Amino acid sequence: MEITMGVMDENATNTSTNYFPLLDPLGAQAASFPFNFSYGDYDMPLDEDEDMTNSRTFFAAKIVIGMALVGIMLVCGIGNFIFIAALARYKKLRNLTNLLIANLAISDFLVAIVCCPFEMDYYVVRQLSWEHGHVLCASVNYLRTVSLYVSTNALLAIAIDRYLAIVHPLRPRMKYQTATGLIALVWVVSILVAIPSAYFTTETVLVIVKSQEKIFCGQIWPVDQQIYYKSYFLFIFGIEFVGPVVTMTLCYARISRELWFKAVPGFQTEQIRKRLRCRRKTVLVLMCILTAYVLCWAPFYGFAIVRDFFPTVFVKEKHYLTAFYVVECIAMSNSMINTVCFVTVKNNTIKYFKKIMLLHWKASYNGSKSSGDLDLKTTGVPATEEVDCIGLK
C-alpha cells in the first residue's frame, strides 16, 4: 500500500503545497519508514499533474506487484503456518535457532494474512487509494513496520547464536530462560522503534487530476519537524539495516573461517564429520538468507535515501511510480525467500507437518485413539538429521 509519508506545511494551500506524499511500503515491509514520495512538481498545482496510474508501464507494474502479493499470501501464509504448527507439536524441534526463526515466521504470517489483502486492494484494485479508514491505515502500516524489524532483529540474533555456538563452543549455551528474554527483546525493540510509523500515519485526500481524488494513507510529518523526520530515518537505517548487516557479515565470515579453513584437531570420527557437514549446511543456508536480505532491501533503502534527501532527482519523473513498484516487489520477495529457505531447505518441517496430519487423520478415522496417545506418539518422534544439524552445539 502506498503510504503517504512526508512533510506538510499545515498552512499550505492546494495550489502551492510543501507536501511530499510518501509511498510507505505497506505491501513490502517498507511500511516502516518515513519515505517521501514526490508525486509531481512541488510548485505546480496538483490538479494539473498527469495521472501516472493510467500509463501502460504503471499497469504492467501493477500486475507484477499483484502477483508478488499473491505469492506472499500463499508462500508466507501456508509455509509459515506449517513451520509454526510443526514447532508447536514437536518438542525436539524447539532449539534456540528454531525458536528465533519462529518469531520471524509469526511476523511474516501475520503480514501475509492481515496486511497483504489490504495492500492488494490499495495497490492493484483501487490504484493507490485507501478506502478503509484511519484506524486500519495506521494499524496495517504499524504491523508491517513491526514485522520488518522483527525479521531483521531475529536474523541478527540467529547469526550471533551461531557465532557463539561454533566459534566459542566451550562457552555455556544460552538457557531457555535467557532465550525467552532474547525473544521478548526482539519484539519489544521492534514495537518501540516502530511507534512513529503509527503516530504520524494519517489519511490525506489529494487531487491528482482535475476530476479525480485519491486518498493516500501514510506518515505525514509537519514541515517544522522535517529535521526529526530525517533523523528518525537515519536512525532506522543505522540500527535496522546497516548495523545488523555489518554484524551478521562479520559473524558469518568468522564462522566460515572456523568451518572451512581451520583444521579439526585429533582423530575425526564419522560423528564429527557428520556434525561438521550439518553445521556447514546450516551456515550456508543462513548466509544465503543474509545475501538475499541485502539484495532485496538495499535497493529499497537506496531509493528511499534519494527520494528523501535528494527529492529533485524525482521531480517530473514520469516513471517514478513504476520504479517504486519494481523496488517494492524486490523488497517484498525477501519474506518469500526466507520462508522457502527455513521451511523447505533448513528444517524439513513439511515432513513433520505431514506426520501431524496423518496422525490426526488416523485418530479421527479409527475413533479409538485418545488425545493422550496422539500426544505420546507425536512428541516421541525422533529428530531427523536436518533437525539435529540445527541443534548441534
UniProtKB/Swiss-Prot annotation:
Residues 1-63, 120-145, 201-232, 304-322 are extracellular. Residues 85-98, 167-179, 254-282, 344-393 are cytoplasmic. It is a multi-pass membrane protein. The chain crosses the membrane at residues 64-84, 99-119, 146-166, 180-200, 233-253, 283-303, 323-343. Disulfide bonds join C137-C217. The keyword Transferase does not apply. Keywords: Cell membrane, Disulfide bond, G-protein coupled receptor, Glycoprotein, Membrane, Receptor, Transducer, Transmembrane, Transmembrane helix. CDD domains: 7tmA_prokineticin-R. GO terms for biological process: cellular response to hormone stimulus; circadian rhythm; G protein-coupled receptor signaling pathway. Receptor for prokineticin 1. Exclusively coupled to the G(q) subclass of heteromeric G proteins. Activation leads to mobilization of calcium, stimulation of phosphoinositide turnover and activation of p44/p42 mitogen-activated protein kinase. May play a role during early pregnancy. Belongs to the G-protein coupled receptor 1 family. This is Prokineticin receptor 1. It comes from Bos taurus (Bovine).
